[in-house]
C-alpha cells in the first residue's frame, strides 16, 4: 500500500517557491512537487493545535485560549455539526439534586461498569471533577432541565447506584431534556467564539508531524475548499477526533465518525488501546440505527419481548431495564435468539413508553417522540418503538493518562509520555470506561478531559515559547501518498470496499463472539485491507472531492477495524462489551490488562500494559475486583 505508517519510505520530492492567495498573512507558503502534480503547502505556527471541534476539542480550545495560548482548532466539518450534537441522555455528576449523592459512589459505579478494566486514578479524577464541570457548563449558559425548585434536574440512568451499590437507584444524570449533547455543543461553541481560538473549518487532518526523537510537532492537513495543504507546527497537539463507529454496518454514529485521530496515531508507530471493546447501545431504532436515549428507560420505559414479558427482570433482578448497556444488549440478543423477538421476522424487541404520561414525554423526551415518529413511524404515546442493539461507542482509543497526555510502552515503562501529543474524548482511552462505558459518562469525559488537556499544557508550557523548526521534508511522505491516492486507478470503488468492511465487522465482531467468528473475521478484515490496494478514485480534483475524502476515511476505518478484530481474537475471556461464548467468564489472572495494538507494515502487532488499580490519593481507596451483578 502507499502508506503503512508515517515513516513510510518514499523518494525525496523537489521543492519550488510559490504562494497561496488563500493563505493567512502570517503563514508562509511554498510548492511541493510530485511526478504528477504540484501542491501548495502553507506553514502555520501556534502554541497549540486542537484537531476536532466536538465537545472535547472545543473545551480544550477554550481552556488553552483562557490560559493565553495561541490556539488553532482544525475540524473537517463545522463545529456544531460534530457528533457530540447527537448525544441525548445527559451528563453524570454527583450533584445530589434529587437524592443524597457522592462522587465516590459515582466512581464505584464507573469502576464496576468498566468491569475492572478502567484505570482507577483516571476514574477518580473524572468523577471528582464532575460536579465542577456541570456547574461550569451551567455558568456557560447550558439550558439544563430544572426541578420545580430551580435545581438542575437529574434522571436515572443505567448502572448508577447509591452507597457503593447498596442504596438503590441513583438519579445522577443532569440533562437538557433529551438533547443534552446539542445544548452542550452550541454552548461550548459560543464560549469558543468569545476567545481568540482560530478555527480552520473543513480542513482534513492527514497525519501527525513527528520528529526523529518521537516528539509530535503538529499535523499536516488538507483544506477541502481550495486544495491547499497546511503544516501546523505546535508545541502541543491535542487529538479530539471522536470514534470509529462507521467501521460497522449499523451504528448510531454520524458518517463522519471514521477514527481519523486513531489512524494518525497508529501510522506514527504508536499503539491504540482496548479497541476490542465496542459498545452496542441496547436501543437503536430497528432498521434505521438511530439512537433512542437510555433516558427513555430512565424516565420509566420498559423493554418487552413477543410474549409481552418485561424480560430484564430475569437477567438483572435489581436494576432491570437500567442495568449497564452491555448487560441489556446481551439480554435482548438472547431473547431474540431464543425466539422471543417481535415483528414478522422475530428479530427485534419493543421499547414501551406508551404507559408514561404524555406530559412527561413532551417535557422530558421531546426529541425521542419526534425521532420515533420519523424513523419508526410510531406514536410513542400509543405504540412501542421497535429497537435492536446498535454500535454506539468505542471504549478503546489512543492511550492517555489522566492529564490527557498520550502514553506508550517504552522499555519497561508502560506509561511513557509521548512529548507534544495529547488526546481527549472518544478518540482517547484514559481509560475511564474500561470494558464498558456507563451511559452519560461520555459527555462528562469530553468536558473533564478536554479541560485537563488545557490545564496540563498550562502546567508544562508557556505561551509564545520558541519551537524547534520543522524539518524541510516534514509531511513530504504524506503529500506523496495523497498524490498517489488521488490518482488511484484500481477496479474497486471506495463504497464497495467500505460495505465489505462494515459487513465483516457487523458479522464477526458483534454482541457475542466466538473463536471461529473472530478467526474468520481476522482473515476477512485482512482481505478487506488488501482490497484497498485496488481502490479506484474517479474524481482527480482537490477541491470538495468527496470521493478522495471518503477514501482517506476508509483507510482510517480499516486500520481501526483490523486492530479491533485482532485484539478481540486474542482476548480469551468475557469482560464488559467483549462477550465470548467460548470463554464466558472474566479472567482477572490472565486478562486484567489493556490491549495495545500497533499497526506495523500493514499488519497488527499486539502488546499489553497493566490496568491502574491505584487511586490518586487517600480521598478514596481503590475498588478490588468482584463479580459484576446488576
From Swiss-Prot:
Binding residues for FAD: 52-57, 75-90, 260, 426, 442-443
Keyword flag Membrane: yes
Swiss-Prot/TrEMBL keywords: Electron transport, FAD, Flavoprotein, Membrane, Mitochondrion, Mitochondrion inner membrane, Oxidoreductase, Transit peptide, Transport, Tricarboxylic acid cycle
Ligand binding (substrate): 281, 293, 392, 437
The EC number(s) this enzyme carries: 1.3.5.1
GO cellular component: mitochondrial inner membrane; respiratory chain complex II (succinate dehydrogenase)
Residues annotated as catalytic: 325
Enzyme class: oxidoreductase
One Gene Ontology biological process: tricarboxylic acid cycle
NCBIfam families cross-referenced by the UniProt entry: sdhA_forward, sdhA_frdA_Gneg
Function: Flavoprotein (FP) subunit of succinate dehydrogenase (SDH) that is involved in complex II of the mitochondrial electron transport chain and is responsible for transferring electrons from succinate to ubiquinone (coenzyme Q).
Protein name, entry field: Succinate dehydrogenase [ubiquinone] flavoprotein subunit, mitochondrial
Organism: Oryza sativa subsp. japonica
Amino acid at each position: 500500500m502507499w502508506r503503512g505508517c508515517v515513516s513510510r519510505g518514499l523518494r525525496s520530492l523537489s521543492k519550488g517557491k510559490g504562494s497561496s492567495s488563500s493563505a493567512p498573512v502570517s503563514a508562509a507558503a511554498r510548492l511541493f512537487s510530485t511526478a504528477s502534480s504540484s501542491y501548495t503547502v502553507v506553514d502555520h505556527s501556534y502554541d497549540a493545535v486542537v484537531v476536532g471541534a466536538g465537545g472535547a476539542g472545543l473545551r480544550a480550545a477554550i481552556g488553552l485560549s483562557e490560559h493565553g495560548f495561541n490556539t488553532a482548532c482544525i475540524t473537517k466539518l463545522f463545529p456544531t455539526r460534530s457528533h457530540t450534537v447527537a448525544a441525548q441522555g445527559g451528563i453524570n455528576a454527583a450533584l445530589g439534586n434529587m437524592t443524597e449523592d457522592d462522587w465516590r459512589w459515582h466512581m464505584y459505579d464507573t469502576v464496576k461498569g468498566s468491569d475492572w478494566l478502567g484505570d482507577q486514578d483516571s476514574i477518580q479524577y473524572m468523577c471528582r471533577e464532575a460536579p465542577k464541570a456541570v456547574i461550569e457548563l451551567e455558568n456557560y449558559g447550558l439550558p439544563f432541565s430544572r426541578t420545580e425548585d430551580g435545581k438542575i434536574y437529574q434522571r436515572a440512568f443505567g448502572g448508577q447506584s447509591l452507597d457503593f451499590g447498596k442504596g438503590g437507584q441513583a438519579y445522577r444524570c443532569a440533562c437538557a431534556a433529551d438533547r443534552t449533547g446539542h445544548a452542550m455543543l452550541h454552548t461550548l461553541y459560543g464560549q469558543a467564539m468569545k476567545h481568540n481560538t482560530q478555527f480552520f473549518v473543513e480542513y482534513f487532518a492527514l497525519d501527525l508531524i513527528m520528529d526523529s526523537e518521537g516528539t509530535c510537532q503538529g499535523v499536516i492537513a488538507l483544506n477541502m475548499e481550495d486544495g491547499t495543504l497546511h503544516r501546523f507546527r505546535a508545541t502541543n497537539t491535542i487529538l479530539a477526533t471522536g470514534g470509529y463507529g462507521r467501521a460497522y454496518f449499523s451504528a448510531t454514529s454520524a458518517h463522519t465518525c471514521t477514527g481519523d485521530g486513531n489512524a494518525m496515531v497508529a501510522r506514527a508507530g504508536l499503539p491504540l488501546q482496548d479497541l476490542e471493546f465496542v459498545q452496542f447501545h441496547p436501543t437503536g431504532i430497528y432498521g434505521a440505527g438511530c439512537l433512542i436515549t437510555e433516558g427513555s428507560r430512565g424516565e420509566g420505559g420498559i423493554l418487552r419481548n413477543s410474549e409481552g414479558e418485561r424480560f430484564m427482570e430475569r437477567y438483572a433482578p435489581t436494576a432491570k431495564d437500567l442495568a449497564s448497556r452491555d448487560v441489556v444488549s446481551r439480554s435482548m440478543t438472547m431473547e431474540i435468539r431464543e425466539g422471543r423477538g417481535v415483528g414478522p421476522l422475530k428479530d427485534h424487541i419493543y421499547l414501551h413508553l406508551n404507559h408514561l404520561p404524555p406530559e412527561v414525554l413532551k417535557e422530558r423526551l421531546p426529541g425521542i417522540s419526534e425521532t420515533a415518529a420519523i424513523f419508526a413511524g410510531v406514536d410513542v404515546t400509543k405504540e412501542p418503538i421497535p429497537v435492536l442493539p446498535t454500535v454506539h461507542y468505542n471504549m478503546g482509543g489512543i492511550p492517555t493518562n489522566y492529564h490527557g497526555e498520550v502514553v506508550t510502552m517504552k522499555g519497561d515503562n508502560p506509561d511513557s509520555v509521548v512529548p507534544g501529543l495529547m488526546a481527549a474524548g472518544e478518540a482517547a482511552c484514559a481509560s475511564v470506561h474500561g470494558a464498558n462505558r456507563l451511559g452519560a459518562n461520555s459527555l462528562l469525559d469530553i468536558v473533564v478531559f478536554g479541560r485537563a488537556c488545557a490545564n496540563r499544557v498550562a502546567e508544562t508550557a508557556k505561551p509564545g515559547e520558541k519551537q524547534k523548526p520543522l524539518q524541510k521534508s516534514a509531511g513530504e511522505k504524506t503529500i506523496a501518498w495523497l498524490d498517489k491516492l488521488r490518482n488511484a486507478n484500481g477496479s474497486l470503488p471506495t463504497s464497495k470496499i467500505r460495505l465489505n468492511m462494515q459487513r465483516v465487522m457487523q458479522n464477526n465482531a458483534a454482541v457475542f463472539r466466538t473463536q471461529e467468528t473472530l478467526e474468520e473475521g481476522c482473515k476477512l478484515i485482512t482481505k478487506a485491507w488488501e482490497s484497498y490496494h485496488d481502490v479506484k478514485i474517479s474524481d482527480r480534483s482537490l477541491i470538495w472531492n468527496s470521493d478522495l475524502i471518503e477514501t482517506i476515511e476508509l483507510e482510517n476505518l480499516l486500520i481501526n477495524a483490523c486492530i479491533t478484530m485482532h485484539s478481540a481474537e486474542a482476548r480469551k475471556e468475557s469482560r464488559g462489551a467483549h462477550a465470548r461464548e467460548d470463554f464466558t467468564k472474566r479472567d482477572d489472572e490472565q486478562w486484567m490488562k489493556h490491549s495495545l495494538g500497533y499497526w506495523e507494515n500493514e499488519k497488527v502487532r499486539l502488546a499489553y500494559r497493566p490496568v491502574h488499580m491505584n487511586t490518586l490519593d487517600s480521598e478514596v481507596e481503590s475498588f478490588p475486583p468482584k463479580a459484576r451483578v446488576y
